Amino acid sequence: MCIRDRVYEGIDICRQQNIEFILAVGGGSVIDTAKAVALGFSYEGDVWDFFENRNEPEACLPVGVVLTIPAAGSESSENLVITKEDGLLKRGYGSEKLRPQFAIMNPETTYSLPFYQTACGISDMLAHIMERYFTKTEHVDVSDRLCEGLMRAIISNAKLVKQDPENYDARAEIMWAGTLAHSGLIGMGREEDWGSHAIEHELSAIYDIAHGAGLSIIFPAWMKHVYRENEERFVQFAQRVMNVELPNSMVYETIMEGISRLECFYTSLGLPTRLSAVGIDSSHLEEMAKKANSCGNFKKLDAVSYTHLTLPTILR
């Protein structure tokens, strides 16, 4: 969401009309815009200051949500992401003050969504889980199982929704899974990564590509690049989530098959898994790498450095 076009305008309207509560009706972009307006309402400076970690909010307007697009999980999270058109900067911020007061979630509101939009949302919520799942924190079996159960539920119900867009039960499962995926519950007690999201933010800041479509490209590439640093976890993902059954001695093959099945799942939903599939060439790779490298929010899976050399490799 472009901060220049919507957030400043919303802040001005709220101040002029003495608004006391913001109701966001929509998906992640709508909710995040509402949160940004709530964040800037009582702040005398530029609301972008928060996204550059220059200040902390003292007060925010309360926000409520009527969810129409399950994807971002913003209806239950303290986080938001917006884009500043000047410099094409896409940045996130989080504060408990921004967690919505309530969220009304009726699966029937999602029946009319184009399936591609539904698929992008599914990719986003899977990525939210995987950013937390791929960790080196030990003894997190409970949250591992929560992550795995959510991913399996999303994958199986995505197939049902593809067959029947008005399958209420499948829509409900996906909507609930998207909320849990980014509520903070499954990340408790474990180091999270968020490298793939940071890379994708630079991609969708420059190009007109849906966030979920960018993630379906970036995440498998990232997995192929970093798996050596924690092979056991990638084997676990392949076996428990993607149902790969190969001999225990075939570690590399198991990992690659797990990633391949994830890519095939994305493809089955009509999502891209290569930059070339969405017409993106290499002209901005170095620029995106430099911006992503300066984000400062990478919690690494491993000892792999997200350098200017590493990032273009993942992006390609």
Locate predicted features.
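Residues on a specific face of well-ordered alpha-helices
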Residues: I31-K35, L39, V63-G64, S76-L80, ...
